[in-house]
Regions:
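One-carbon transfer enzymes
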Residues: 1-121
Length: 121
């Protein structure tokens, strides 16, 4: 079975994580300390998790304890350092809610709304 490490935040992160966990083995989760739904999900499903700022090696000191095929980032609050990106056995990717670079950042749909657009392209 394909093994994954998931970096996610907020409701979008939780919804995506819940769906992914039905099909794949989640070895670890990185999230922020305010994503209570993700923390509860990890706790209830016995998935090891790290909360807080992963920068300066803090996240990697946790991640290096796991071997995963894929690392996926979904609406993750923090910038991801190179050591985490390179840790997967085959692929690390980010799911973003718009075409880059116009709406970069975590909430492209919000800025599209503010600008009166119907799509975050």
């Amino acid at each position: 079975m394909l093994t994954l490490g998931i970096l996610c935040s907020g409701r979008l992160g939780l919804n995506t994580l819940s769906k992914i966990a039905k099909e794949y083995a989640i070895e670890f989760i990185l999230t922020d300390s305010n994503s209570f739904g993700i923390i509860d999900f990890a706790t209830n499903n016995h998935i090891p998790f790290f909360t807080g700022n992963p920068r300066k090696g803090n996240g990697y000191s946790f991640v290096r304890n796991f071997s995963v095929d894929v690392i996926a980032s979904i609406n993750y609050l923090f910038l991801i350092e190179k050591d985490i990106i390179e840790h997967s056995n085959s692929l690390t990717f980010n799911i973003h809610g718009s075409l880059l670079p116009k709406y970069r950042g975590r909430t492209p749909h919000v800025w599209a709304n503010i600008n009166g657009e119907t799509k975050a392209e």
